[in-house]
Curated annotation (Swiss-Prot):
An annotated GO cellular component: juxtaparanode region of axon
E.C. number(s) listed in UniProt: 1.1.1.-
Identification of the protein by name: Voltage-gated potassium channel subunit beta-2
Record InterPro entries: K_chnl_volt-dep_bsu_KCNAB, K_chnl_volt-dep_bsu_KCNAB-rel, K_chnl_volt-dep_bsu_KCNAB2, NADP_OxRdtase_dom, NADP_OxRdtase_dom_sf
Length: 367
């Protein structure tokens, strides 16, 4: 794991007392409180991101109305969240359109926002997907048009592309940065070996290496973020931006009694999630949630807040992306920040005992 408190930690922490916008109030989650918001460096870059970000997968341009999307973004921004993540493939580009319209309407300073998008699946034509120089440049241009922005802060390669030479991808990412279309680039769903290859190519040809990997991370999926990415951080400075802290809602407990209507697992095209929940492994996970519920009650928080705080306790995580379909959900999730200081080493040990899936690095085996 990462050292507890070094300036080299990928998530160098700072607290900002947010002013009037940082006032959080919900009768359900307690009295009005001035929110202390964490900011962390994205990997070893100088880019400061809120430790919670708002993702737009499934929700923006799809599951929720544009009015609800605006409400969620406003709530996030007012509570110090500066990171908003999308992708060219989300709702076939509509998520980017909705996000861009809201930014324009609200009149927020562009310099106060960190906007990230992902490139890989752009359209039906053979040349409209992948990580070729052609698609990276054309895809990002199209994304910027939908977002109505001059640049994104981070452009991610949304998955590895075995059909494109790594040098071509790294050169194209360097080009879009040099052209002012993006500030940084990162990877998503890449293996450690692929990220390392991109870094080596960048160093060999004096190009720009990636600063961050977007990875799935929650109580039931730990290996990559807890073992592989820390090694990459120490070697080449790549940080972790994580998604699905509630395992697509499984950890929220809402699937305890089956698949409720209007939930993500009930949506068309999400049969894989339904199958996952109803599988033998899914049932085992549901059983463990009852034990986590008892811990959450002891800490005076909800199960989703405990799960998100658990992700945040990992200093290797620069930011955790949240998905929410209504204001109450988002407010509850933001409240995880107040649970973070309550996660003592004994509580973490207790959670590890219930999960029984703590991954071990090579270093642990040697010791």
């Amino acid at each position: 794991m990462y050292p507890e408190s070094t300036t080299d930690s990928p998530a160098r922490l700072s607290l900002r007392q947010t002013g009037s916008p940082g006032m959080i109030y919900s009768a359900r989650y307690g009295s009005p409180k001035r929110q202390l918001q964490f900011y962390r460096n994205l990997g070893k870059s100088g880019l400061r991101v809120s430790c919670l970000g708002l993702g737009t997968w499934v929700t923006f341009g799809g599951q929720i109305t544009d009015e609800m999307a605006e409400q969620l973004m406003t709530l996030a921004y007012d509570n110090g969240i500066n990171l908003f993540d999308t992708a060219e493939v989300y709702a076939a580009g509509k998520a980017e359109v909705v996000l861009g319209n809201i930014i324009k309407k609200k009149g927020w300073r562009r310099s106060s926002l960190v906007i990230t998008t992902k490139i890989f699946w752009g359209g039906k034509a053979e040349t409209e997907r992948g990580l070729s120089r052609k698609h990276i440049i054309e895809g990002l241009k199209a994304s910027l048009e939908r977002l109505q922005l001059d640049y994104v802060d981070v452009v991610f390669a949304n998955r590895p592309d075995p059909n494109t030479p790594m040098e071509e991808t790294v050169r194209a990412m360097t080009h879009v940065i040099n052209q002012g279309m993006a500030m940084y680039w990162g990877t998503s769903r890449w293996s450690s070996m692929e990220i390392m290859e991109a870094y080596s190519v960048a160093r060999q040809f004096n190009l720009i290496p990636p600063i961050c990997e977007q990875a799935e991370y929650h109580m039931f999926q730990r290996e990559k973020v807890e073992v592989q990415l820390p090694e990459l951080f120490h070697k080449i400075g790549v940080g972790a931006m994580t998604w699905s802290p509630l395992a697509c809602g499984i950890v929220s407990g809402k699937y305890d009694g089956g698949i409720p209507p209007y939930s993500r697992a009930s949506l068309k095209g999400y049969q894989w999630l339904k199958d996952k929940i109803l599988s033998e492994e899914g049932r085992r996970q549901q059983a463990k949630l009852k034990e986590f519920q008892a811990i959450a009650e002891r800490l005076g928080c909800t199960l989703p807040q405990l799960a998100i705080a658990w992700c945040l306790r990992n200093e290797g995580v620069s930011s955790v992306l949240l998905g929410a379909s209504n204001a109450d959900q988002l407010l509850e999730n933001i409240g995880a920040i107040q649970v973070l200081p309550k996660l003592s080493s004994s509580i973490i040990h207790e959670i590890d005992g219930i999960l029984g899936n703590k991954p071990y690095s090579k270093k642990d085996y040697r010791s």
